[in-house]
Regions:
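Active-site loop-to-helix "anion-binding N-cap" substructures in soluble metabolic enzymes
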Residues: 2-251
Length: 251
């Protein structure tokens, strides 16, 4: 019955292309566009987050279908200014982005702290972008049993003084699972998803799982009760693999 509920609801599939892709990559999207117009997509919602250099091209490519566009990061300032090499949320919105990934562990490792992420989220919300807010614990934190403490802190500080949360998605990505092929046990993931949603008063935000999501493990991952979708890294570079993930979620 739980699985039936999962496969009858809207699920979000976010393709995080990271620092991959060129204009030649646009040709690989034809299969995805065709799939998005078929009944096989079921209630899947596809969101592509390419590098900034490709956002405008992706936007044009996807104009006549239901695939949405997102960015992967932004400068914290809503205002334009003298910030060489950076791009802000307003600029991303102006070239077609509707979503943005913020707080990804790869950026946290480079020095992004909760306060900075909070500033970025506020700026992006002001630009009318929907936020995919990444949270997750390291392997050592997980082994010490600190997962819930870390997630609670990241949520509290990252969303500090943000009252309206309807345009925020939470993406739970255990840092030790990203790109490693290792995923937590399904029953553990279910507890974490429940815990994350329990951090919010009223209607909780939609929660996605990210970390080594691929066509081989999606049949297990789709069993997670109360999950709203997936943040997909490497597997999303392949149209076939990304489509397979969506198909298997609804099969």
């Amino acid at each position: 019955i739980i699985l039936q509920q999962m496969t009858n609801k809207y699920m979000y599939f976010v393709a995080n292309w990271k620092m991959f892709g060129s204009l030649k990559s646009l040709n690989t999207l034809n299969k995805v566009i065709k799939f998005s117009k078929s009944k096989e997509i079921n209630k899947g919602r596809l969101i592509y987050c390419p590098p900034n250099t490709l956002i405008s091209s992706f936007f044009k490519k996807f104009q006549n279908c239901l695939i949405d566009i997102g960015a992967q990061n932004c400068h914290e300032s809503y205002d334009y200014g003298a910030h060489t090499g950076f791009i802000n949320s307003r600029m991303l919105k102006s070239v077609g982005a509707n979503y943005i990934i913020l707080g990804h562990s790869e950026n946290r490792k480079k020095g992004e702290n909760d306060k900075l992420i909070n500033m970025k989220i506020k700026s992006a919300l002001k630009s009318k972008l929907k936020i995919i807010f990444c949270i997750g614990e390291s392997l050592s934190e997980n082994k010490k049993g600190k997962t819930k403490i870390i997630l609670s802190k990241q949520i509290r500080l990252g969303l500090n003084k943000i009252k309206k949360k309807s345009n925020i998605f939470i993406a739970y990505e255990p840092v030790w699972s990203i790109g490693t092929g290792k995923i937590p046990k399904i029953n553990e993931l279910e507890k974490i998803i429940r815990y994350i949603k329990g951090q919010f008063k009223g209607k909780p935000p939609k929660v996605l799982y990210g970390g080594s999501v691929n066509p081989k493990n999606i049949n297990d991952l789709k069993k997670i009760n109360n999950l709203d979708g997936f943040l997909v890294g490497a597997a999303s570079h392949s149209a076939k693999k990304f489509i397979d993930i969506v198909k298997k979620t609804y099969s």
